[in-house]
């Protein structure tokens, strides 16, 4: 994504010898025609490619929906880029079911992307609607933002759902790549133990997680709200108490400053 620091540069460098050997997707938070046009050209340059397979409108919310679809909106730039052969398909990502539901009805997009995992299934009807229209479905947050520690179980669960096409878990090292690859290549039915573990997670973890979408920002007193939840996760899920507490205390504003 354009906003993910140097990710496009790194991928471009890694694939420069054979840039079209992978199906590549990226995305932009641009909402206007000129801003999106600039981002598309920038992505092509950073990725060292003559075209991008899938270019997505990144995290579209209700506030910007009308602008994106307007004459001066980002969608126009994407459609022009597709006509010019600079991108092959146009997609949309969001943390809002209602936004994706409306976007699907426009028939402007090849793919939709939404959070979905063992404990968060609010997007099922959106994904089913998209599949019924021949669209591709992409799952973000398949591990619930790190809350699901058993990556193999989390991914195997998702591969058994016929309305999901692509899973995009984050991977930090080669070991995680191998675990994820093994999970999605295992086409055996879920075992009784796996089903029991899934049932336990559904019943005990709840379905409310911070996805760091930024909808809660800005805070009126300057608290970085997503960071508060991120540090909580490091404390409770990864047992990094000293690190998490130190980071929390060093913040300019934290939860104790909430009015």
How would you label these PLM feature ranges?
Residues 124-259:
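Structured C-terminal cap/extension of enzyme domains
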Residues 9, 34, 101-102, 175-178:
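Alpha-helical elements of the RecA-like P-loop NTPase motor core of helicases
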Residues 22-24, 90, 137, 167:
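Hydrophobic/aromatic residues located in beta-strands of well-ordered beta-sheets
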Residues 22, 109-117, 188-194:
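Short hydrophobic/aromatic-enriched beta-strand-loop microsegments
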Residues 31-138, 143-146:
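Glycine/proline-rich, positively charged
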């Amino acid at each position: 994504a354009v906003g993910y620091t140097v990710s496009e540069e790194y991928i471009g460098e890694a694939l420069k010898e054979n840039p079209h050997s992978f199906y590549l997707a990226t995305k932009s938070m641009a909402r206007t025609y000129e801003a999106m046009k600039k981002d598309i050209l920038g992505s092509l340059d950073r990725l060292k490619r003559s075209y991008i397979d899938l270019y997505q409108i990144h995290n579209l919310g209700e506030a910007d929906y009308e602008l994106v679809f307007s004459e001066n909106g980002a969608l126009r730039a994407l459609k022009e880029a597709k006509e010019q052969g600079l991108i092959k398909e146009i997609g949309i990502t969001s943390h809002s079911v209602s936004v994706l539901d409306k976007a699907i009805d426009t028939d402007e997009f090849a793919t939709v992307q939404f959070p979905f995992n063992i404990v968060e299934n609010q997007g099922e009807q959106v994904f089913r609607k998209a599949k019924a229209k021949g669209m591709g479905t992409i799952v973000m947050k398949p591990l619930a933002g790190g809350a699901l520690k058993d990556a193999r179980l989390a991914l195997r669960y998702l591969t058994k759902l016929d309305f999901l096409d692509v899973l995009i878990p984050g991977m930090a090292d080669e070991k995680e790549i191998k675990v994820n690859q093994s999970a999605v290549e295992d086409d055996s039915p879920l075992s009784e133990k796996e089903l029991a573990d899934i049932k336990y997670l559904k019943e005990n973890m709840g379905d409310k997680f911070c996805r760091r979408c930024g909808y809660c920002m800005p805070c009126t007193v300057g608290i970085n709200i997503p960071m508060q939840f991120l540090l909580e996760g490091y404390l409770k899920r990864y047992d990094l108490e000293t690190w998490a507490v130190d980071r929390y205390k060093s913040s300019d504003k934290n939860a104790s400053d909430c009015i």
